[in-house]
């Protein structure tokens, strides 16, 4: 998968401090993402040579079902850890969820300074890895239960750490990103 390779190179060059190559591979992986998403979209267009409304619907509905399952499973993980029944997922998008690690960090480290970016980044990465591993394991159950398949390509990864964010409408939001794909940002 070219996009996976580009993302690896993006992270590698970001960690090495090679901004030029980091930006190059960041753009390359984004192009791959857009091409793939466009292919899914064009399947539902009657003017497309390989038009297939069943495949277009299956792609859309599987994605919607998976993101709802991801939200539910993530909330269950947080509820179990925090012993509450709150909704901890802040926002879901087509292929991602936004959730704050602050409640878990505050529970684990009650005297922590949550304004300390270095401390918080380290702890957020730990919490994100735990949640990510839990979700990816649960995707096996999802595939068997809802799709009747043993093999799948579902994989969720933590991508950004934002110090703050705001949402004005669906798909219209801003984030103060301090870490992207494991690379510290200014």
Regions from the language model: what does each represent?
Residues 1-186:
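Conserved acidic
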């Amino acid at each position: 998968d070219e996009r996976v390779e580009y993302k690896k190179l993006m992270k590698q060059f970001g960690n090495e401090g090679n901004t030029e190559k980091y930006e190059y591979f960041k753009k390359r992986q984004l192009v791959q993402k857009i091409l793939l998403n466009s292919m899914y979209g064009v399947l539902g267009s009657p003017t497309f040579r390989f038009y297939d409304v069943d495949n277009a619907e299956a792609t859309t509905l599987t994605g919607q079902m998976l993101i709802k399952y991801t939200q539910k499973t993530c909330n269950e993980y947080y509820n179990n850890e925090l012993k509450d029944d709150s909704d901890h997922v802040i926002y879901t998008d087509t292929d991602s969820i936004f959730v704050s690690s602050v409640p878990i960090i505050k529970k684990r480290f009650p005297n922590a300074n949550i304004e300390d970016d270095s401390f918080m980044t380290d702890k957020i990465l730990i919490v994100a890895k735990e949640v990510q591993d839990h979700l990816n394991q649960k995707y096996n159950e999802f595939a068997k239960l809802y799709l009747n398949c043993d093999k799948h390509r579902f994989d969720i990864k933590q991508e950004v750490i934002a110090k703050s964010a705001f949402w004005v409408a669906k798909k219209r939001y801003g984030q103060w990103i301090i870490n992207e794909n494991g690379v510290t940002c200014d």
